[in-house]
């Protein structure tokens, strides 16, 4: 199940929650935009590796991403998600590091 909530379009602040079919895994991404064009980063939490790429169409926007992953047991990975709006595109992929 994929869920997202766009809190404010003007400041491009949003919260995105993704739940795998298994209730034992939850991923929450909180992104705050404030001033660069493109950023790509890799975050490792537990046995999960998260790759995040963001392209902003406005050069004055900067992306800061905080990723929180919580899980109770191993679930089928990888999975990916693409979110596109008028002002930016956000792509991330999740894979397990065995």
From Swiss-Prot:
Its main location: membrane. It is a multi-pass membrane protein. The keyword Membrane applies. It comes from the Eukaryota. One of its GO terms (cellular component) is membrane. Keywords: Membrane, Transmembrane, Transmembrane helix. It is found in: Membrane. The chain crosses the membrane at residues 13-33, 65-85. This is Putative uncharacterized protein YA5053W. It comes from Saccharomyces cerevisiae (strain ATCC 204508 / S288c).
């Amino acid at each position: 199940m994929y869920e997202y909530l766009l809190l404010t379009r003007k400041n491009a602040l949003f919260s995105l929650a993704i739940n795998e079919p298994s209730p034992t895994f939850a991923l929450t991404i909180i992104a705050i935009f404030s001033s660069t064009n493109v950023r790509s980063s890799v975050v490792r939490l537990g046995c999960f590796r998260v790759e995040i790429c963001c392209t902003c169409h406005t050069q004055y926007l900067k992306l800061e991403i905080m990723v929180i992953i919580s899980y109770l047991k191993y679930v089928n990975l990888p999975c990916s998600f693409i979110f596109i709006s008028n002002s930016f595109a956000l792509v991330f992929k999740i894979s397990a590091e065995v």
